[in-house]
């Protein structure tokens, strides 16, 4: 018989840096999930990824206190800031530009995010990434 799922939890955890300290520990502890077991499994699963990259993770937990988790790709904003070499986006997007990004880089970001985006083709995914870039105050050139 299949295990009965009692909920899901969504977190953004830096790759290879899951620790029992807040915010991870309390979020898992109040749901009865073994914190150290999750931290070890998450860090092992993300050891090949860029250290510190924010990884969205969906944790499904069950009645018998066990859990499974699935990893997503880092947010588009992380890739955009990395490609444009920024620390943060514009305080006033649309008015103040903080930099520019080429369509080639937009395409490479869209290709890497394709499995997590709600898009049918690469062009639609590129438009989504361009929208995120504009919302951060980046100009799309080329």
Curated annotation (Swiss-Prot):
A GO BP entry: translation
Q: Which domain of life is it from?
A: Bacteria
Give an example GO cellular component term for this record: cytosolic large ribosomal subunit
The disulfide bridges present are: none
NCBIfam families the UniProt entry points to = L11_bact
User: Which PANTHER family does UniProt cross-reference here?
Assistant: 60S RIBOSOMAL PROTEIN L12 (PTHR11661), LARGE RIBOSOMAL SUBUNIT PROTEIN UL11M (PTHR11661:SF1)
Primary role: Forms part of the ribosomal stalk which helps the ribosome interact with GTP-bound translation factors.
Q: Subunit structure, per the record?
A: Part of the ribosomal stalk of the 50S ribosomal subunit. Interacts with L10 and the large rRNA to form the base of the stalk. L10 forms an elongated spine to which L12 dimers bind in a sequential fashion forming a multimeric L10(L12)X complex.
Give the family this protein belongs to, as stated in its UniProt record. Answer: Belongs to the universal ribosomal protein uL11 family.
Q: What is this protein called?
A: Large ribosomal subunit protein uL11
Write down the species: Bartonella tribocorum (strain CIP 105476 / IBS 506)
> According to the entry, what is the taxonomic lineage of the organism?
Bacteria, Pseudomonadati, Pseudomonadota, Alphaproteobacteria, Hyphomicrobiales
Which gene produces this protein? rplK
């Amino acid at each position: 018989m299949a295990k009965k799922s009692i909920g899901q939890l969504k977190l953004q955890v830096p790759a290879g840096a899951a620790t029992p300290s807040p915010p991870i520990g309390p979020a898992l502890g109040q749901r009865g999930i073994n914190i150290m077991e999750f931290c070890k499994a998450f860090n092992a699963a993300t050891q090949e990824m860029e250290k510190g990259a924010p990884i969205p993770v969906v944790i499904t937990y069950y009645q018998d206190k066990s859990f499974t988790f699935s990893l997503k790709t880092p947010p588009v904003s992380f890739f955009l800031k990395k490609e444009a070499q920024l620390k943060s986006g514009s305080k006033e997007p649309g008015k103040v530009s903080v930099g520019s990004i080429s369509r080639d880089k937009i395409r490479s970001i869209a290709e890497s995010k394709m499995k997590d985006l709600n898009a049918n083709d690469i062009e639609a995914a590129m438009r989504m990434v361009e929208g995120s870039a504009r919302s951060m105050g980046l100009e799309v050139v080329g």
